[in-house]
Regions:
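Bacterial N-terminal signal peptides
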Residues: 11-18
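A generic structural motif
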Residues: 83, 114-116, 160
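Surface-exposed, glycine-biased beta-strand/turn segments
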Residues: 24-108, 139, 169, 181-207
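Zn2+-dependent peptidoglycan hydrolase active-site motif and core
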Residues: 92-130, 154-156
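Bacterial N-terminal signal peptides that target proteins for export
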Residues: 2-10
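Conserved beta-strand positions that form and line the central face of beta-propeller blades
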Residues: 81, 89, 112, 122, ...
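Sec/Tat signal peptide C-region and signal peptidase I cleavage site
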Residues: 19-23
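Conserved, short, structured surface segments that act as functional micro-motifs
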Residues: 135-201
Length: 207
C-alpha cells in the first residue's frame, strides 16, 4: 500500500468513525414528548422571549427538501402535501434528533425531528418509518418510505416552533424546494409564537 493510499484509507476510516459517533449520540425524550405531537420545547426560550435562525448562508449539506423530486402544495396554510412516486424516500430537512416515530390515528406513520436550530419538522402518512426515537439524523438522511395508495403517494410535511404549526412557506419555497435566504425571528407571545423575517424579500413568501 502506497503512502497516498494509506492516507486515503486513514481519512476514510476517520470519517466513518465520526459518522458512527454522530449516529450513536442518542438524545433522551420524555414519554410525553414521544407521544404528544404538539408539545412545547423545553428551554427553547430560556434566554429570552425570542431567538433567530439564520438561513442566509446555509450549506448544501445542511439542508434537504423532504422529497426532492416531489410536487408540493400548501394545505390550509400550515402544512405541505408533497406528492411523489411509490417507494420514494422521505428525507430529513436539517440535522436533529428523532422525537417521535410511531403510528398516529390522525396522521398514520409519523416522524417528528427536533432540530438543532430550534425548529421541529413533521413527516406524516409514511408507509414505513425507518428511524427510532432518540436517534440523531443528518440533513438528507432517509427517515421513511412515502405512503399512499394506487392513486396518490404523498408526504404530509409540517414545521413547528414550540409545539405550534407555522406556515412552512415562510421558510421554504414549495415550487423551487429551496430555503428562503433570510434571518427569521421567533418571538414568544403568551401561548403562541410569532414568526417574522428580519432580512428577506418578503414578496417571495407565498401567502
Amino acid at each position: 500500500m502506497t503512502i497516498r493510499s494509506k492516507k486515503a484509507y486513514v481519512i476514510g476510516l476517520l470519517l466513518s468513525l465520526s459518522s458512527l459517533a454522530f449516529a450513536q449520540q442518542a438524545v433522551l425524550f420524555t414519554p410525553a414528548e414521544q407521544q404528544q405531537i404538539f408539545i412545547t420545547t423545553a428551554g427553547l426560550f430560556s434566554n429570552g422571549n425570542n431567538f433567530t435562525i439564520d438561513f442566509s448562508d446555509v450549506d448544501d449539506s445542511e439542508y434537504c427538501f423532504p422529497l426532492p423530486v416531489g410536487n408540493a402544495s400548501l394545505l390550509q396554510g400550515y402544512s405541505l402535501e408533497i406528492v411523489t412516486s411509490k417507494g420514494d424516500a422521505v428525507k430529513a430537512m436539517f440535522d436533529g434528533a428523532v422525537r417521535m416515530s410511531r403510528k398516529s390515528p390522525q396522521y398514520g406513520n409519523i416522524i417528528i425531528i427536533r432540530h438543532d436550530n430550534g425548529l421541529e419538522t413533521i413527516y406524516a402518512n409514511n408507509a414505513q418509518n425507518l428511524v427510532k426515537v432518540g436517534q440523531r439524523v443528518k440533513a438528507g438522511q432517509t427517515l421513511a418510505i412515502v405512503g399512499g395508495n394506487k392513486n396518490k403517494y404523498s408526504c404530509l410535511f409540517g414545521i413547528m416552533v414550540n409545539g405550534g404549526w407555522i406556515n412552512p412557506t415562510i421558510i421554504v419555497d414549495p415550487n423551487s424546494h429551496q430555503l428562503r435566504s433570510q434571518v427569521i425571528r421567533c418571538t414568544k407571545k403568551s401561548n403562541r409564537v410569532d414568526i417574522g423575517a428580519t432580512k428577506t424579500d418578503l414578496q417571495r413568501i407565498v401567502s
